[in-house]
Amino acid sequence: MLIKRWSISAALIVVLTAFLLALLHLEAPSAHAKATAPVVSPGSYGSGALGSWQRNDRVISNSPAVRETVKNNGVVLFGDSIAVQDGNALGRLVGQQLHTSFAQYSWAGQPTSAAVDAMAAWAREYGLPRRIVMAVGSNDIFDPPVFAAQVERALRIAGPDRTVYWVDVQVSRTDEPAAVQVADQRNSEWINLQLEQAALQHPNLRIVHWAEFLAANPDRLHTDLRDGRHTTVPAGQNARNTLILQAIRHS
């Protein structure tokens, strides 16, 4: 089963190996626009700085949809730009395969802290269903040390009786210089390590192993990602959403 827990050391070795192989066969930069501004300075962690995101594209379910999802104990999604693209397709799969309601709060470019803010606001206004998908973390590569505290915050809001499904991170922006790509990869693994450590302390945190799925076949870094971060459609979108559905169904 793709979503089974990997050991931290094995997962990091596989991801690093796959990334280095892919870097040797790097394709031309993607024609798609990036969700964040070009890297001007490497910043403290080599990936640059997170650009302004508040005016970026977003997909946010209306109040009736959220209330219906909470009432039916359906599935809610908090995500970033990948979810802006893929969230509606995930919602259709949730309806078709799990036969339940779906609502989302997805905003391109938002870091985990902003997604957890939205989660807290929904918890106050609507409550939360028992299944929560967190598809954020990609925009935390610019400041990885802050991520763990936001995971803990999300889990406190969710409480022990809800399950949080967190999609791990694979970022290595192909339209940045090689040194930045390496920093992106290193910071992605740092974020994923923090997720693994949190899961050891919280049995209701389930990791969706997207990074390990990509690393298991290095070709997927090109067939399932269009720019080193965002999924291709339909291949990458279908693969990632299927992993999320598998995690929910097997919990």
Protein language model features and the residues they cover:
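N-terminal secretory targeting modules
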Residues: 1-76, 83, 125, 220
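Active-site segments of SGNH/GDSL-like serine hydrolases
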Residues: 139, 157-189
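Conserved beta-strand segments of alpha/beta enzyme cores
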Residues: 101-103, 163, 204-206
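Acidic-histidine catalytic/liganding microenvironments
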Residues: 97, 161, 202
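Catalytic His-Asp segment of secreted/periplasmic serine-dependent ester chemistry enzymes
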Residues: 174-251
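Short conserved AdoMet
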Residues: 127, 159, 200
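Extracytoplasmic/secreted proteins, especially bacterial periplasmic and envelope-associated proteins
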Residues: 77, 89, 93, 131, ...
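Conserved SGNH/GDSL esterase-like catalytic core that processes O-acyl groups on lipids
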Residues: 48-55, 63-150, 173-175
